[in-house]
């Protein structure tokens, strides 16, 4: 009995017992191809949503680093012209930040511009970019302390503002970083695959 049921399963899996249809082999192949293409597209869409969600939370395993699909290092995109740095006003979680929220502190704008340039450099490390940004912001407080003398309330307020700005970028900056890296970099094997 086991042999008969095994034979039946094998026979059905090989296409036995199916009524012959009028479809040509080309039509069957295109249906099969469409099905596989559709499944692949569905998995890629789900993967894309998952990656976007991870970027929002800070990257895979908390590491926000742009990598090519097969582990190779990304290469600078030929002819890529980075956007002009836009200061501290920008997009926050995909929403345009009103210009009134930009504090208009020239030194802070300079720090934000440096961060934009760092993010737009192919192969950049987000955490190094963020560390330079933090150092730049804290240098504003140091300069303020030197010019005003020791004023503890002003110094504390400056440090608090700088830490808030830095922590926001550190925590929620993965998505802008990844978007900048996608624009600035190219993965050679992925380009070949799309052709």
UniProtKB/Swiss-Prot annotation:
Primary residence: secreted
Entry binding sites for Ca(2+): 89, 91, 93, 116
Keywords: Calcium, Metal-binding, Secreted, Signal
Listed GO biological process terms: arachidonate secretion; cholesterol homeostasis; lipid catabolic process; phospholipid metabolic process; triglyceride homeostasis
Record family assignment: Belongs to the phospholipase A2 family.
Cofactor(s) the record lists: Ca(2+)
Role: Not known; does not seem to have catalytic activity.
Pfam families named in the record: PLA2G12 (PF06951)
Organism (species): Homo sapiens (Human)
Name by which UniProt lists this protein: Group XIIB secretory phospholipase A2-like protein
Expression across tissues: Strong expression in liver, small intestine and kidney.
Co-factor binding details: Binds 1 Ca(2+) ion per subunit.
Signal peptide: 1-19
GO cellular component: extracellular region
Sample GO molecular function, one term: phospholipase A2 activity
Location(s) in or outside the cell: Secreted
